[in-house]
Amino acid sequence: MNLLLLSNSTQHGRGYLEHALDTVTGFLPAGARLAFVPYALADHDTYTARVRGALADAGIDVRGVHEGGDPLARLDEADAVFVGGGNSFRLLSALYRTGLREALVKAVRGGLPYMGASAGTNMAAPSLRTTNDMPIVEPPSFETLGLVPFQINPHYLDPDPGSTHKGETREERLREFLEENDVPVLGLREGSWLRVEGDRAVLGGERDARLFRRGTAPRELAVGSDLSELLDVRGEFDTGTRS
């Protein structure tokens, strides 16, 4: 498969996709017809226009899958697909409702380049269980696209040792996930991304990532790390830690 999985689409102080623009335009075929999936936000037209503006100078023809009335037809005519960020629960619900969930799996496994950002990157994992988002809607299932066999946590945020906030840190939430599921989780800090080409996966971007596994301490991963071994994991959900 051919995947570009961004932690975020907007970096502080920079424009939409600006921090990853060279990587994005290098990933997409020249002059590509890009099917954009805007369902993670409520205003699909404005969202699509924003993506179109960001990629116009690169000669990318951005087409919202909601435009024209048939999302599946938009996907069929595309040279690549971009699933944008927003609320992951809203996005997954729409993928099920439109039939795009099954169509995306088939198309991407058949060679269609897939780019995700934030919620779109969450969709590439097997399950929605490591999203940061509020469940504003209830999808039919937490099962996402399963393009990679491990979980991803976009926008991964390190604990602040000076914070007086008493809610759970991101690390604590991911440890709770691992108490119930034996599936590795890749924490992608903002500014980082994962590039998958066939059987090879490499960490890219400006910041290191963090890998969580059951029974071991979190491991820091430097930009440029080869993470291909993660493509071979066989995780198990709902295993718990009880004997």
Curated annotation (Swiss-Prot):
It catalyses: Dipeptidase E catalyzes the hydrolysis of dipeptides Asp-|-Xaa. It does not act on peptides with N-terminal Glu, Asn or Gln, nor does it cleave isoaspartyl peptides. InterPro entries: Class_I_gatase-like, Peptidase_S51, Peptidase_S51_dipeptidase-E. One of its GO terms (molecular function) is serine-type peptidase activity. It is an enzyme of class 3 (hydrolase). Disulfide bonds: none annotated. Its EC number is 3.4.13.21. The keyword Hydrolase applies. Its main location: cytoplasm. It is found in: Cytoplasm. Pfam families: Peptidase_S51. GO terms for biological process: proteolysis. The active site is at residues 118, 133, 155. Keywords: Cytoplasm, Dipeptidase, Hydrolase, Protease, Serine protease. GO terms for cellular component: cytoplasm. Hydrolyzes dipeptides containing N-terminal aspartate residues. May play a role in allowing the cell to use peptide aspartate to spare carbon otherwise required for the synthesis of the aspartate family of amino acids. Belongs to the peptidase S51 family. This is Peptidase E. It comes from Streptomyces coelicolor (strain ATCC BAA-471 / A3(2) / M145). The gene is pepE.
